Amino acid sequence: MNLKKILSAILVLFLACSITSLSADARWFEKYSSFVPSNAVGENEVWVGTFQLVWNDFQDKIVKAPVKFEEGTPKLVDELNRQPFSSSMLSDNSYFKAYGEKSLELKEEIENGLMEKFGEKSAIIDSIDWTSGQGYVVYAMLKKEFKYLSAFPEIEAAPFYGSGESVRYFWIDKNTSNPTLYQNVDVLFYNSANSYAIKLKTKEGEEIILYRTDDNKSFDDLYSAVMKKQKRFWFGKKELGEQDLLKVPYIKFSKQFSYDELCNKKIVGTNGLFIDKAIQTVEFGLDNQGGNLKSEAMVISTMSLIRRDGGREFFFDKPFVLFMKEANQDRPYFALKVKNSDLLEKVSKQ
């Protein structure tokens, strides 16, 4: 069964802001498409802010003006030019950026910077020739690792939304022997057995928002819906009660995306500069203890030479959306729609 039939929407937001940010004015999200570029993974969808970080520096430091193409500018470029996400919405210890003329010296700066800050090596910088041609490279890495306040127990593997294969889940049931688990979870709203959202809290101040919905809408519309519904749930029970149930699937995937629609088009006012390559990677994992996110992005430009017992059930075993944000920020840096089990961690066959 495809991912669309399994998860109609998953938004994972790590936002550096408190939950009060969800009640902020939602009209900003409706005016522009702010989760760009959004990437299809089968019938699932993922967004992370890393490419926007790279684009911001490409626009501000290299082109030094809004990017326009001589042969016509696509909508994606106009949306990126608005810079709806920036490094000011992230803590300094969660990202690394570098830009400059393409050279072995810049490559070494990136390698040393990543190792010093994250103890990481890049998976993409060796994909280009650093010695040929005139041009520029803009690079960024976003990295997050987080642990829940308490680790959740794992439940027996089960299918996701009718899929033919079982996936792993963690959960809280009404007979849990660890009452501290409830401190991991805030209820944002519960409107019905098919419309609810929760927030998972972490030791590092990251917030994972899980929204159960079948709506096939944009991340902007989905996040706006969470904010509006949470604001209206002022009378509801905000804590997970002893009769409430929670079930969340493990998530694990690694993908690379290329944005060919941005490439090989001369940029206005640059004497022939064009984007030669625009790429982004996403690695994401979520399990019963916490999770991790690592994403790289790079733009290379070149000069032309030419429910139970009355309790509620918060089960994320059907289409859902996931957002990730820092607790003191009001913009997410990661979003994910899960429609099937393609991105979920499978049970090994014995």
Task: List where the protein language model places each region.
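Bacterial N-terminal signal peptides that target proteins for export
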Residues: 1-10
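Hydrophobic-core positions in well-structured secondary-structure elements of globular domains
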Residues: 23-350
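Bacterial N-terminal signal peptides
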Residues: 10-18
